[in-house]
């Protein structure tokens, strides 16, 4: 408040492990000229931060989650813990609309979109070509540093939109990305980003099948989920089932997930009919069937029978365990009165926890989660993000 009253320019530094609600402070203070999110860099974080602030290093990180304007903008904001009055059970009702998929599909404007991140320089991103090779799409993208002072790196992101049908899908999905090397002012780099056909598929829970529906799939190019331009349209001529799977974890009770309203569906349909799409190049894309569960099993047994036998032995041991013995797999190895940061790890001191050792006698070891010591080794590159 003091700096705002004195009209002093301020750089807001966030040393937090997740999104922070900033809308109110940004609306009330007009002297915040920049925000630097350093995300808990570790003991050398101060040196890395100083290099960025002094211009010795150029930030090139991107947000790996959407930052909402208000906490209430998240779809399950009132569902967790005591907020809905049920302390015994948590239901995750987002379904396919997780993160940016929810904000895009339901028309919620975020404070900072998924994939967002600024630099001290600027870039031009241009699609130079697209080639379909068997079961993948090969895109060629040119990135040019259009600034005149700082070298920098940029992250190219490719998203796909889907044909609007009775089968519910999110509006768009990240299907590929790549980061450039350090580009000097005026320098250009060509990136090749390959998109596997399964990344364009949707999962049918009723038939347990990965499918691609007939229709137009738009490929959008940019540097965050809200700054995109259509680069190509893929025309899929027929409905295709790419992969048939077996159900292994069926729902034990009905789960009511959120769904698009008819009004929102119509808005998404109209958006894909805009005149500007008429100028976008179109390509015919014919996906191919990948495999069935029986084919996968036959391949494994044919190529590595011993592995299959070991796998069956492990499964048989796990099947003998009671539900009470398996429940710790859900919450990991924790102890009362022990901090979850820095002292919760058993195998690696300094780690922030680990999974359960409930299956160690079956040959399945516990896994160490986020380790603070690993942050120290990567503190310099952590400001780069992706």
Q: How would you label these PLM feature ranges?
A:
Residues 194-225:
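Short, surface-exposed ligand- or partner-binding patches at beta-edge/loop junctions that are enriched
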Residues 166-205:
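Intrinsically disordered, low-complexity Pro/Gly/Ser/Thr-rich segments with frequent PxxP/GP/PP motifs
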Residues 150-158, 170, 203-206:
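Short, hydrophobic/aromatic beta-strand segments
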């Amino acid at each position: 408040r003091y700096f705002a009253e004195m009209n002093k320019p301020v750089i807001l530094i966030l040393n937090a492990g997740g999104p922070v609600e900033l809308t109110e402070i940004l609306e009330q203070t007009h002297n915040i000229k920049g925000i630097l999110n350093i995300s808990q860099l570790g003991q050398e974080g101060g040196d890395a931060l100083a290099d960025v602030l002094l211009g010795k290093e150029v930030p090139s990180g991107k947000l790996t989650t959407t930052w909402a304007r208000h906490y209430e903008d998240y779809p399950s904001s009132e569902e967790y813990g005591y907020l809905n009055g049920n302390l015994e059970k948590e239901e995750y009702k987002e379904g396919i609309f997780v993160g940016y998929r929810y904000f895009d599909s339901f028309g919620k404007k975020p404070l900072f979109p998924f994939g967002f991140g600024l630099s001290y320089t600027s870039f031009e991103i241009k699609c130079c070509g697209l080639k379909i090779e068997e079961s993948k799409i090969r895109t060629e993208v040119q990135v040019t540093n259009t600034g005149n002072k700082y070298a920098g790196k940029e992250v190219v992101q490719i998203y796909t939109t889907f044909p609007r049908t009775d089968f519910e899908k999110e509006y768009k999905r990240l299907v590929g990305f790549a980061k450039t090397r350090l580009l000097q002012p005026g320098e250009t780099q060509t990136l090749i980003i390959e998109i596997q056909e399964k990344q364009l598929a949707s999962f049918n829970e009723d038939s347990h099948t990965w499918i691609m529906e007939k229709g137009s799939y738009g490929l959008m190019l940019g540097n965050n989920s809200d700054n995109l331009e259509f680069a190509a349209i893929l025309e899929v001529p027929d409905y295709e089932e790419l992969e048939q799977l077996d159900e292994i974890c069926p729902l034990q009770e009905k789960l009511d997930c959120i769904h698009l309203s008819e009004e929102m569906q119509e808005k998404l349909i109209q958006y894909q009919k805009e005149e500007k799409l008429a100028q976008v190049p179109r390509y015919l894309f014919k996906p191919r069937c990948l495999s069935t569960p029986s084919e996968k099993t036959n391949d494994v047994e044919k190529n590595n029978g011993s592995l299959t036998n070991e796998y069956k032995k492990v499964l048989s041991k796990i099947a003998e365990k009671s539900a009470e013995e398996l429940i710790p797999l859900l919450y990991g190895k924790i102890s009362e009165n022990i901090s979850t940061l820095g002292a919760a790890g058993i195998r690696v001191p300094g780690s922030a926890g680990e999974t359960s050792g409930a299956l160690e006698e079956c040959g399945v070891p516990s896994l160490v989660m986020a380790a603070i010591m690993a942050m120290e080794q990567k503190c310099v590159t952590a400001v780069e993000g992706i």
